[in-house]
Amino acid sequence: LEPPTTPNLFSLAGLEGKMTSVIGDIRNFAALKAAFDAAQPEIVLHLAAQPIVRDSYKDPRYTYETNVMGTVNLLECVRTAQTPPRSVLNVTTDKVYQNNEWCWGYRENEPLDGFDPYSNSKSCSELVTHSYKNSFFADGSVAISTARAGNVIGGGDFANDRIIPDCVRAMAKEESIGVRNPYSTRPYQHVLEPLAAYLLIAQRQYEDNRYAGYYNVGPDDCDCVTTGTLVDLFCQAWGDGAAWENRAEANAPHEANFLKLDCSKLKSTFGWKPRWHMAECMQKTVAFSKVWLSGGDIPAEMDNCLLYTSDAA
């Protein structure tokens, strides 16, 4: 589909003129298959989704159609391809797990049972992937994995009902930031952390299908913070004029209160680890947001942020 917000990072970065891009609806199998067959990909990263919890309460049918049948359609393209790809990664969410509100991070072998329509649709997407993997690719001819990523933040996100975009919008209006759930704990991480993990998983299973599996992708325990703490860090990074207030909603739809991931499997299998702690993550996010608000050079700021890859040294 077209980017769902105006502005959006795809347009701001001028990517349309720098890559082959096909706009379409993943629910439309015929159109998806035509684009898939034309591309003949060797590696497939499935990130298309309706990704907002609160939107899933407003339109659960669309959420399930997109997140469940969209996954079915994508895997049908893989199954029926004349030359199937060698590596497929389905990106789901940390919210696929049955949330017991306990202090431990969920592991990949925990029960999948998301509560709200968004989370549950992603649990279903996991099960669909598992079924296709067992039913049609048990010979390992196509290496298929899923990645269950924690809450992603960073510059260039303009979605509704997400904490960092809400913070930036408030700063643009010179208003106090309203926080709905300041005491909720989430595995927040900069967007480049999971993106690096996705590419790593896709590459390694392309080279050796024994790496195919199910992987949590999230921050270290020390960076699993409350939303209130996250916004404190945002305000510190932003500087003068940044402040927030608790705007809890009395009849808000259910959202998990405490959620953490155990990423031991990803770390031990690939030697992966997060590169930025939350304070540095927020500094990068605020820097990007200020460049955007001032009408600065977004592609140049993205290049600066991508120096992330050199931070591993």
Say what each PLM segment does.
Residues I177, I201-Y215, S294-A300:
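Core catalytic loop region at the nicotinamide-binding pocket of NAD(P)H-dependent oxidoreductases
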Residues Y308-A313:
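Conserved small/polar residues in nucleotide/adenosyl-binding loops
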Residues L1-A149:
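N-terminal Rossmann-like NAD(P)+-binding domain of SDR-like oxidoreductases, especially those catalyzing
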Residues C167, A197, R204-A252, D262-C263:
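Mid/C-terminal beta-alpha module of Rossmann-like enzyme folds, strongest
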Residues R27, K58, T66, D116, ...:
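Residue-level signal for the nucleotide or nucleotide-sugar donor/cofactor binding architecture
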Residues N100-G105, N109, P117-Y118, S123-Y206, ...:
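NAD(P)-dependent short-chain dehydrogenase/reductase
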Residues F270-P299:
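A contiguous, mid-protein "functional segment" used to position or interact
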Residues K58, A149-G156, G178-Q189, R210-V225, ...:
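Glycine-rich Rossmann NAD(P)(H)-binding loop
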